């Protein structure tokens, strides 16, 4: 016979698995549709018209029209495509289901159009809203927070292709007590995360790891080098943190989201022309291309890091629906490669992983997620002790510093003004 604690954990197992599978399927559906539309916009259509896909006019035109299209969706769809991600954390309160169709359309347009944001925030919003709405009807005795946690865990597992990230993140939020141990609370979320990760793995495997030279034995000088790299990445990230609310306030002085996002798309197009096609989109596939291109120099990596960080700030400030983690990882990779090219004595594995750790820590202010992203992009167990040590001064640098979010009390998203 099972202990009552075990029966309690099993109670939510079936809903957790169902939510994990559904979270993954929603992500896969959105990414597949966005991929088809992206291929149409950036491959087939310019080929049919006899235009080079990296033509400055094409890049500027597509991104400007993408901004206008997303602005129209936000302006006229029911629920105005959900909350402005610039004003929200990754895991937020559930939104009304009526806002989800507009949010999904806005996300797909942004992903396909080359906007420098990832899918993580909108997908998280969609999955939480559906889990809470459906769960409240099927099992009304289960509170909304439980559904939110399960949907969040399932989405994280689906996004990263592993339940490890969910385990790390929720281990610091689901604090155990004398009555309910931590792993009792983690049981159902990990079931959801595992189901989400396994479902994603049936269709495609998220490819985060980069072909970077293996790092051998850790030395004391490597710790100092890693801490300096992380500090440089944090400094770059804090510039973006300073710029985001100010640019957001300036752009949203225009009350119509069509104008705001149209101008934002135009700026993104200009940045895309400067940085080239590799600086567009969410950044995961593009960072693979960046590492594979042996022709890039120190100045090229620096330019890509600056352009991508600027594009991230502009896209978020304009109100595009998307997340900031994936493009931040691209920035970290570009910074790390730049620093390695500048000081070849420091291994690329250290510069890239520590730069990712620093920039993701700025964006998420989540130590476990930052460690996870650094370790998964540069998969080397020898680096783990070094990353844990480097995290300490990095965390000290960011203690009490503002987060990469807009204070919603000072600045409302555009759809609240129409």
From Swiss-Prot:
The chain crosses the membrane at residues 10-30, 54-74, 99-119, 120-140, 149-169, 186-206, 223-243, 258-278, 300-320, 322-342, 343-363, 371-391. It is a multi-pass membrane protein. It comes from the Bacteria. Pfam families: Voltage_CLC (PF00654). Its main location: membrane. Keywords: Cell membrane, Ion channel, Ion transport, Membrane, Transmembrane, Transmembrane helix, Transport. One of its GO terms (cellular component) is plasma membrane. Disulfide bonds: none annotated. It is found in: Cell membrane. The keyword tRNA-binding does not apply. GO terms for molecular function: chloride transmembrane transporter activity; monoatomic ion channel activity. The keyword Transmembrane helix applies. Belongs to the chloride channel (TC 2.A.49) family. This is Putative ion-transport protein YfeO. It comes from Escherichia coli O1:K1 / APEC.
């Amino acid at each position: 016979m099972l202990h009552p604690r075990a029966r309690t954990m099993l109670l939510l197992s079936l809903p957790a698995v169902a939510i994990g599978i559904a979270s993954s399927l929603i992500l896969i559906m959105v990414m597949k549709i966005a991929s088809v539309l992206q291929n149409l916009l950036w491959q087939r259509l310019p080929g049919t018209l006899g235009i080079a896909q990296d033509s400055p006019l094409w890049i500027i035109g597509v991104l400007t029209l993408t901004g206008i299209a997303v602005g129209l969706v936000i302006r006229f769809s029911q629920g105005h495509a959900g909350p402005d991600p610039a004003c929200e954390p990754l895991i937020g309160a559930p939104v009304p289901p009526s806002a989800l169709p507009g949010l999904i359309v806005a996300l797909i347009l942004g992903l396909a159009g080359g906007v420098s944001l990832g899918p993580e925030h909108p997908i998280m919003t969609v999955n939480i809203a559906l889990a809470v709405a459906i769960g409240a009807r099927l099992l009304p005795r289960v509170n909304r927070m439980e559904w939110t946690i399960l949907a969040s865990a399932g989405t994280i597992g689906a996004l990263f292709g592993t339940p490890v990230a969910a385990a790390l993140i929720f281990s610091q939020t689901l604090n155990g007590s004398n009555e309910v141990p931590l792993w009792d609370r983690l049981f159902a979320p990990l079931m959801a995360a595992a189901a989400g990760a396994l479902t994603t793995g049936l269709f495609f495997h998220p490819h985060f790891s980069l072909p970077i030279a293996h790092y051998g034995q850790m030395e004391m000088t490597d710790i100092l080098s890693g801490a300096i790299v992380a500090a440089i990445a944090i400094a770059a990230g804090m510039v973006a943190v300073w710029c985001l609310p100010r640019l957001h306030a300036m752009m949203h002085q225009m009350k119509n989201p069509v104008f705001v996002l149209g101008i934002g798309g135009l700026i993104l197009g200009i940045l895309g022309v400067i940085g080239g096609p590799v600086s567009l989109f969410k950044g995961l596939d593009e960072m693979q291309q960046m590492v594979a291109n042996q022709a890039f120099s120190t100045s090229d990596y620096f330019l890509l890091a600056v352009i991508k960080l600027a594009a991230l700030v502009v896209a978020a400030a304009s109100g595009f629906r998307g997340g900031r983690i994936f493009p931040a990882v691209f920035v970290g990779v570009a910074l790390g490669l730049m620093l390695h090219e500048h000081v070849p004595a420091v291994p690329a594995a250290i510069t890239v992983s520590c730069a990712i750790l620093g920039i993701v820590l700025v964006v998420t202010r989540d130590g476990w997620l930052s460690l996870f992203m650094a370790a998964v992009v540069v998969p080397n167990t020898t680096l783990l002790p070094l990353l844990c040590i480097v995290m300490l001064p990095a965390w000290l640098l960011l203690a009490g510093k503002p987060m990469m979010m807009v204070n919603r009390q000072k600045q409302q998203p555009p759809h609240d003004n129409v």
